[in-house]
Amino acid sequence: MTDPHAPALRHGYFGPQGTFTQMALASWLTADDATLAAARPFGTVALALDAVRAGEVDRVMVPIENSVEGGVSATLDALNSDDPLVIQGEVLVPITFVLAAPRGTDRAAIRGVGSHSHAWPQVRGWMAANLPSASYVPTLSTAAAAEALAGLGEKRPPYEAAVCAPMAAEVFGLEVLADDIGDNRSAVTRFVVVSRPGTVPPPSGADKTTVVIYQHDDHPGGLLELLEQFAARGINMTRLESRPTGQAMGSYCFSIDFEGHVADERVGETLMGLRRVCADVRFLGSYRRADGRPVEATRTTTDEAYADARAWLQSLRD
Ligand SMILES: O=C(O)C(=O)C[C@]1(C(=O)O)C=C[C@@H](O)C=C1
């Protein structure tokens, strides 16, 4: 049970208002949390994560993975640098884009379109078919593109329209010139709630764990060695990406999500295996998966199977 006298957690998100990330936070907050209006927007993912590290807020919502464009590098890299952070939970948000502009804008007058770098590739086909001569102008977020058009920014932006969420068009009083312009109508983005390390949510039976792994050196079979740790314990991976470490050309780490909770025996054994064969393993949290799908262990990888094997080994040693 939550303590009714405990202060509400202070939340932040990758903003400004009207981002898909704010929508993710709205669906995450419960009646016990402070309201969405009290949540602080941060203009970049790195600023949002730094605010948690500095203790300015307790939790922030950031995008991590899109079903069309893949991993959000800014988040993967910022989660992985500086002081440790952990993921407390995840949210899935269906992504619907609109083309929005100040009221009265003539579509024929649009020369530039502003949006986030992860949004643009998701509307590329629509743009090529409908606004082939418009050039793309990158902005910090989809909502930042809309906000600047509304004249709230310091100066006029170098574009006439924005690709953003319907909510951003509404918040910043823009006119929707075209609805539902995503090339893939079933696009979904996954967002994560991040805090400083301290508590790990209890196992729910439908959990995921995120780690970043650094290998000792570049050698034949290095990746296989690492994958074997998962395969041998019947663990399903749900995302695997290599990211440059930035230390030297060809130096990569692996960012991995897999099914199970750090409290599960098979997950513990896998983490120990990784720790043995790799130079470093950064634990980024165990949390309930957004779709709530239960994680099934195979007959040979249940907690009971591990406990039985451990008891047997102990009896031999005794
Ligand atoms: O710019 C926003 O509105 C965001 O919340 C970021 C973000 C992302 O980084 O993927 C979220 C969902 C969309 O796929 C496009 C942009």
Predicted ranges, named:
Residues M1-D318:
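Domain-level signature for soluble enzymes in the chorismate/prephenate branch of the shikimate pathway
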